[in-house]
Amino acid sequence: MKNQLNFNIVSDEELAEVNGGSLQYVMSAGPYTWYKDTRTGKTICKQTIDTASYTFGVMAEGWGKTFH
């Protein structure tokens, strides 16, 4: 499917060059990772693992611990 809205996908490094800051890793919890924008000081949350993969991973880990 063609991108009809003409969005450009940029990496964090490219975005840092455009806005004058960079994203610094803060922490990860579950399928989410938090970054801090060094220019604005705002904390940004990105989902870095899809929900289904994370859920199945948690279930598999629990089953593995239960039956070991």
Swiss-Prot record:
The lineage of its organism: Bacteria, Bacillati, Bacillota, Bacilli, Lactobacillales. The keyword Secreted applies. Residues 1-21 form a propeptide. The keyword rRNA-binding does not apply. It comes from the Bacteria. One of its GO terms (cellular component) is extracellular region. Kills Lactococci by dissipating the membrane potential of the cells. InterPro entries: Bacteriocin_IId, Bacteriocin_signal_seq. Pfam families: Lactococcin. Keywords: Antibiotic, Antimicrobial, Bacteriocin, Plasmid, Secreted. It is found in: Secreted. NCBIfam families: bacteriocin_sig. This is Bacteriocin lactococcin-B. Changing residue 45 to A/D/E/F/G/I/L/M/N/P/Q/S/T/V/Y/W: No loss of activity. Signal peptide: none annotated. GO terms for biological process: defense response to bacterium; killing of cells of another organism.
